[in-house]
Amino acid sequence: MNLYAHDLSLLDFNYNVSGPFGEPLSHRFLSPGPFFQGEEDDYRRNTSYSHDGANGREPDTDSRASPPHRHDGRSPLPLGMDWSSPPRHLEGRDTVWPHDHRTGWSYCVTVPSWVDLPKSSVSDPAVFYRVQVAIQSPEGITSARLVLRRFNDFLELYSSIKKEFVKKSLPQAPPKKILRMRNQTLLEERRCSLEDWMNRLLSDIDISRSALIATFLELEAAVRSYFNDEYQETEDTSGDIPSLLPTTISDVPGSSSVTIDHDNDSADETSNASTMKHDEANLKNLFSRNSTAVDNVTDWHELITEYGLLDQSSFQEKVERLSSTNGDAATGTVTRGGISSGVGIQRLDGSDRKFQELTIESIKKTHVSDFEASTAVEPDLVNQGAMDIHGEAHGNMYGAVGGDTETQKDLAIVFQSEERHKLKRVIDTLKQRLETAKADTEDLISRLNQELAVRQFLSTKVRDLEVELETTRESCKQGMEKTVLDEKERFTQIQWDMEELRKQCMEMESFLNSIKDEKTHIETANESLVQENQMLLQQINDIRENFENFHKEHEELEVKAKAELKVLVKEVKSLRTTQSDLRQELSGIMKEKLEMERIVQREKDREETAKNADKKLLHECDVLQNRLQECNVKFDIEEEGKLIMDSSSLSEAIELLATSDNRIGLLIAETQLLSEEVEKLKLTSGGHRGTDDLVRKMLTEVLIDNARLRKQVNSVLRCSLSGHGISVREAGTEVDDEEGSIDLARTVMSKILEK
């Protein structure tokens, strides 16, 4: 969101503000350059100013396709300004920046110093850093403004930019350290780090054009301050203008006129040289600041004063003489036969108006509040024989206007028509000189900018080396201090160790004394021990004799043990032979055990298969029994001995009986197949299974007998139906039930056929 899109100021509406900055802010380029397309050219932000477009060829219409660059006309900041690297030294209005100022408005940021200011009357003073925002116009005029910011403000700016530009890799902000003592060196280091961080941050074009930066640096206030300074200086320099200009201001609102007498041209050309030099200096001083905006304006004024095209001293005398003669009378139109020829100035709206004259003395008494020399106009020829200006040249409208006038842009310089050819020749010569001087000046400026850039780079490197040297010096100093502290700690530790060693020496001396006492006691004890040793030696001799006796007895026992060992070896051999026989018997028994386990498992499997077969047989018998029950045909026996079927016709009843016979035949065939499967199972299982096989056989026979009986019953019913011994029930209210039974029979039959 652009904070400056709808924040219009007094400068935007051009409310009675004169000077080059009085134009609407949409005209960003106030001087002719490669992007200036004429007098009526408006600065449009979305226009792509490529190199071809600046030279008259068709510019690139797709401005969004090209990457953004400095002064490309897309900056949303006030006046479309862009960040630039700061100059080496700020030298006021004529500061030289390391770039071409004609490209557009620029701003730079430096942190020159800091100041201690109290937040309130009670609190302690806090450190505020002076942030200097310098602005340079396309004319090369520099203005600066200071903004006070705390260190926390810089950190808040960093966090806000980090949130807005998430994908950008931002330079790290200076670390926040607690300054217990406000040392000048530490504050200076922090100031340098803040300035370097701001320049590295603003080197990104997107960040330098963001609203956060504009708000933090108060760029709009800086622009207003620039224009206020410009306006104040214009006011100061405009005090000498009324005495130099031959203009009169009428008391009638909305009208003005200039009347000039050229009765004696020869006298005009022989004016005082000193007066001309003074006027020339004043005019040059007046229009020096607008020379870059409109080049022809300053050249014409210099020509008028330098080459004597208009003698101002005689000019003022003629005006005074005319004013004393006419007084306050209104001036008429000038004719050829008149004694004096007057020149009327055409207003910008095209209407020729005549105004009363004021004397030069009244003009000098008038308070001059504003002055402007920016807009070029082309005056028309007024009456035959009047002085005019060549159609291709544009005059410079300038004048001194009081605080109550509204026609400050409606006046222009006029001169004699006889001097036109001389003026043209001089203008052409000066134009050539001016172009050559401009080319040389641009070359020198480019070289100077290169030298300044190199010097600035070298100064930056030197400053970085100084900062690095200072940091190294501080680190070395801190290291030495730390080393000294460590050595002091080690010295104190050694002193404590020496004290401990002294204590240990005293303890060792006391311990040695005690050892000496013990040694004397031990010597006395040793004497007693020697006597005891002699007694022990005698006892040892006695024990040795006993040992020899025991050794002899042991040898005898060993001989006996060897004999017994031989006997035991023989017994072990016999046991080993018996052990091999037992192992063979054990292996045979294990084989028999495995065989029995296989047989038992086989029997278990056979019983399991038999159980499954029995379950399957019972299930199939149940299924066959149900299917046999489905083959029944419903009959009702009445008292007269007639059978009544639930059928709508006789043919349908016969069809049902035939279907039932077919199904019963299929059931008999399936039962026979089941009995054959039972026989096969009996053969595969081997031998007789006893009662289970008999039960299976009986079940199959019972099913077959029932099926045959049903088939015989159906044949009997068919015969009786063919003899018309059975009556058919009329279809009535039970039609739905009969249709359901027929559908059920058909469904069962289809299932049987599918099987």
UniProtKB/Swiss-Prot annotation:
Gene: EREX
GO molecular function: phosphatidylinositol binding
KO phenotype (gene knockout): No visible phenotype under normal growth conditions, but the double mutant plants erex and erel1 exhibit severe growth retardation at a juvenile stage.
Any Pfam family matching the protein: PX
Coiled-coil segments on the chain, per record: 420-585
Membrane topology: Peripheral membrane protein
Task of the protein: Acts as an effector of RABF2A and RABF2B. Involved in vacuolar transport of storage proteins. Regulates membrane trafficking to protein storage vacuoles (PSVs). Binds specifically to phosphatidylinositol 3-monophosphate (PtdIns3P).
Subcellular location: Cytoplasm, Cytosol; Endosome membrane
Annotated segments matching region Disordered: 36-85, 252-273
Gene Ontology terms: cellular component: cytoplasm; cytosol; endosome membrane
UniProt xrefs under Gene3D superfamilies: Phox-like domain
Keywords for the protein's UniProt record, in alphabetical order: Coiled coil, Cytoplasm, Endosome, Lipid-binding, Membrane, Protein transport, Transport
Record-annotated PX domain positions: 107-224
Quaternary structure, from the entry: Interacts (via PX domain) with RABF2A and RABF2B.
BP GO terms, sorted: protein transport
Record's protein name: PX domain-containing protein EREX
